[in-house]
């Protein structure tokens, strides 16, 4: 799949990022991961991101990363394209990127570099180096320390033909509008704020109709119902799902830092697809919070 073909796929539909399965000892559980991917693939996501932020990329050893990407690519070979999360320092990100390409990933999600403070010129140089290390398509994720503006993205687009996507995790509307207007159809644009459904209608109005869904991991039918309501501008259906599910969900998620991942793993367990515990420094939901989520999921009915 060439970068432009990937760009076309990412320009439509719902995207998601499976959690990574760990066993009771905290080691990667490929059998559970295969079962998860086989469950989720038929629900109709346009692409899946393996070892992304919700897939705990930041906690994976290099050998585990290879196992996760290979398992995802092999399992979904005939069903849905797999993009691999990559990140860390420039040299680390290049090693991950080249390994993902070797294993058959169709594209990459370039996560923000970790902790190091840097100018945005330096961040742009980091992005360029990773893009030029591979031939597959790359989506850059503006979030946290990565805050590339329209000027820098325009330069990167000229230098890196395989940079085909922009994912926004900042929520800076002025910046999003300037990037969308300046870059036009050069990129595929993805909404990437945590619990992106809450912002989906607003982002669609800005020309960003595609987003990645975390809750697809455990209420895939509800996630697709919401996406379809957004797509057809069914404001009543959107409002009802936000009131009935997403706002109560946020009340639980926002109780503790890092719960954006932890709550998804809890939901997967409730749904019958236990992915094991999160790895430190993240923490799992309390028993009370787990029961609150279970009751909320029960209201959504069979998936």
From Swiss-Prot:
GO terms for molecular function: 4-hydroxy-tetrahydrodipicolinate synthase activity; 5-dehydro-4-deoxyglucarate dehydratase activity. GO terms for biological process: D-glucarate catabolic process. InterPro entries: Aldolase_TIM, DapA-like, Dehydro-deoxyglucarate_dehyd. Keywords: Lyase. Transmembrane segments: none annotated. It catalyses: 5-dehydro-4-deoxy-D-glucarate + H(+) = 2,5-dioxopentanoate + CO2 + H2O. Pathway: Carbohydrate acid metabolism; D-glucarate degradation; 2,5-dioxopentanoate from D-glucarate: step 2/2. It comes from the Bacteria. Its EC number is 4.2.1.41. Belongs to the DapA family. PANTHER family: 5-DEHYDRO-4-DEOXYGLUCARATE DEHYDRATASE 2-RELATED (PTHR12128:SF19), DIHYDRODIPICOLINATE SYNTHASE (PTHR12128). This is Probable 5-dehydro-4-deoxyglucarate dehydratase. It comes from Pseudomonas putida (strain ATCC 700007 / DSM 6899 / JCM 31910 / BCRC 17059 / LMG 24140 / F1). The lineage of its organism: Bacteria, Pseudomonadati, Pseudomonadota, Gammaproteobacteria, Pseudomonadales.
């Amino acid at each position: 799949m060439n970068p432009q073909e990937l760009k076309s796929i990412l320009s439509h539909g719902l995207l998601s990022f499976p959690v990574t399965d760990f066993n009771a000892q905290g080691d990667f559980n490929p059998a559970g991961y295969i079962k998860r991917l086989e469950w989720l693939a038929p629900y109709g996501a346009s692409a899946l991101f393996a070892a992304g932020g919700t897939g705990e990329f930041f906690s994976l050893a290099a050998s585990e990363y290879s196992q996760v990407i290979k398992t995802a690519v092999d399992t979904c070979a005939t069903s849905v394209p797999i993009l691999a999360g990559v990140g860390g320092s420039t040299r680390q990100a290049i090693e991950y990127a080249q390994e993902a390409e070797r294993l058959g990933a169709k594209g990459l999600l370039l996560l923000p570099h970790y902790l190091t403070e840097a100018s945005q010129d330096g961040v742009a140089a980091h992005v360029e180096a990773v893009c030029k290390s591979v031939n597959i398509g790359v989506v850059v994720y503006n979030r946290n320390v990565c805050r590339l503006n329209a000027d820098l993205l325009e330069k990167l687009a000229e230098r890196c033909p395989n940079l085909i996507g922009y994912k926004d995790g900042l929520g800076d509307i002025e910046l999003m509008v300037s990037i969308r207007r300046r870059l036009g159809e050069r990129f595929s644009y993805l909404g990437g704020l945590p619990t992106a459904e809450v912002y989906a209608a607003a982002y669609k109005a800005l020309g960003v109709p595609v987003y990645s869904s975390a809750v697809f991991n455990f209420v895939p039918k509800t996630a697709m119902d919401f996406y379809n309501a957004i797509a057809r501008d069914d404001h009543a259906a959107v409002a009802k799902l936000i009131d009935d599910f997403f706002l109560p969900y946020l009340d639980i998620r926002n109780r503790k830092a890092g719960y954006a991942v932890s709550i998804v793993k809890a939901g997967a367990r409730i749904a019958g697809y236990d992915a094991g515990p999160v790895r430190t420094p993240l923490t799992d939901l309390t028993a009370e919070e787990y029961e609150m989520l279970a009751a909320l999921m029960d209201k959504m009915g069979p998936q």
